[in-house]
Amino acid sequence: MKLPKSLSSHCFYSKTTKLRLPYSSLIEDFKAAKARNLVTFQESRDECIKNAGIVVDAGTKANTPAEVKEAKSRLRVQELVGVPNKGKEGLGMRKRQYYSSSSTKQKRDMIVKTVREKEEECRVVKMTNFPNQGANLRWEVPQRQVKHNDIIKASDERLKFLIKSVYDLLPTPANKNRWFNTEEKCLLCGLDGTLAHILSGCKVALCLGRYKWRHDRVLKEIAGAVQAKVTENANKAENRRTRIQFVKEGQQRKEVNHEEEHFNHLSDAKDWKVTVDVGTSLKIPTEICITNLRPDMIIVSRKTKQIGIVELTVPNEDRIEVSGELKRSKYEQIAQEGRLNGWRVKIWAVEVGCRGFPAVSMSAFLKDIGYRGASKKKVIENLSKVTEEASLSLWKASHYKEWGGKG
């Protein structure tokens, strides 16, 4: 892929970074295998093997007895501390298997897992020493896992852009100033040309409509997914209304599972109309409220007096939560006025990072409209791909003052 040599190898093997690549560390696998062998001998049911004092030689790569001893100590300490919460988890969200009450096989697996966790901690510590390459650890977005099949299908240019943009290794003016001691600025506005500035913060690029162009491409992809689900729900409602089950003598009626059909916001009606603010001046219907705000998408059912307002933002990944709060507060008054007028109003503020990392709000939105499992995963993959390609085009255009590559 011709990645720069300054890219740390820990970025390829880390399991906690926001971009998880399908590679594993040979040293980590070697240490885990040696630890498994040693624990197998130490915890053997055969007393002769257990008391034989078999030594597992790991060479200069690892000190297996010390690592196994430290792993056991960690497991005992965790048993004394209890089950701590991680992130925004509530009480009782996770259960921990205790080392003292586990079987021999479970103890062996727990020790190997602890050895791997220690290696991951060392990688994270080393990555935090690099302020640019470790910045993605602070992003409030779900982890994105890249598989071997994705690497085979993706173009080399898009794959290199994804990896370099996540770890901030693109030759931006700010990086050139740090690498080569130059004094370059953003070509369009003359400010510091960091990657976040180029992809989502340049005011001149905003006035030229470059960010709007990327925004519309992502919005069209979301609108296509919403329209497909609206059509699917309408067909299901029609089939459910006309289907008659005939039961023969001696047989029982088969229960039909409509769980997914009832637990989404689009299953209550079949006259939904999807309108997108692309090339038109979209406005909220006046019978709901009178406002000058123009949402990105509205989903209206006049028979049931329901409306869904979708507001999309494509910010930098470290500003996703701030952007979501601003959008929700922006339309809160409209939601209150609509409810006073007898309408059921739902506000969806969704975000997709400029590098192609959909936020949690996007996953929640797709779940609300009826996407589950593989279908939701497919939509998220398409959104990531569209955003990556658009941001790659913006990155190329940042070297020129016009889209055509002139000037």
Per-region residue spans from a language model:
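Short beta-strand-loop-alpha-helix junction that forms the active-site gateway
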Residues: 294, 306, 311-326, 352-354
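Domain-level recognition of nuclease-like catalytic cores that cleave nucleotide substrates
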Residues: 345-407
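Metal-dependent nuclease catalytic cores in nucleic-acid-processing enzymes
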Residues: 328-343
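Extended C-terminal regions of large enzymes
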Residues: 3-185, 387, 391-394
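Active-site metal-binding core of divalent-cation-utilizing nuclease and nuclease-like domains
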Residues: 179-180, 234-309
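C-terminal, well-structured subdomains that either form a transmembrane helix-short loop-helix hairpin
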Residues: 188, 295-301, 308-316, 331-334
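Short Cys/His-based metal-binding microdomains
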Residues: 25, 177-229, 307
